[in-house]
From Swiss-Prot:
It is found in: Cytoplasm. This is DNA-directed RNA polymerase subunit Rpo5. Keywords: Cytoplasm, DNA-directed RNA polymerase, Nucleotidyltransferase, Transcription, Transferase. GO terms for molecular function: DNA binding; DNA-directed RNA polymerase activity. GO terms for cellular component: cytoplasm; DNA-directed RNA polymerase complex. It is an enzyme of class 2 (transferase). It comes from the Archaea. DNA-dependent RNA polymerase (RNAP) catalyzes the transcription of DNA into RNA using the four ribonucleoside triphosphates as substrates. Part of the RNA polymerase complex. The gene is rpo5. Belongs to the archaeal Rpo5/eukaryotic RPB5 RNA polymerase subunit family.
Length: 90
């Protein structure tokens, strides 16, 4: 990816309709999974090839935290498990 493409891609994260995304550290991921009482693969998935995952340099097995604005809660956190989809396999 060229530096120009990378720079223009970063603008995606700054768009008003794109919620904040961040990679969780291992410690944070363990804490979130304990709090939710689930295993990582039970989280909704996000492809390692997703534009946001690529910008964050996410690897399969990582967990991405998404913070969305909510009219009722003010702010809501969602989590996605990064997976490496193989071509032709869903």
């Amino acid at each position: 990816m060229s530096s120009k493409t990378r720079k223009s891609s970063r603008v995606i994260l700054e768009h008003e309709y794109v919620p904040e995304h961040r990679l969780l550290s291992i410690e944070e991921a363990v804490q979130v999974l304990k709090m939710l009482g689930i295993k990582p693969w039970q989280l909704p998935k996000i492809s390692v090839n997703d534009p946001i995952a690529r910008l964050l340099k996410a690897k399969p097995g990582d967990i991405i935290e998404i913070t969305r604005r909510s009219y009722t809660a003010g702010e809501a956190k969602y989590y996605r498990f990064v997976v490496a989809y193989q071509k032709g396999v869903k």
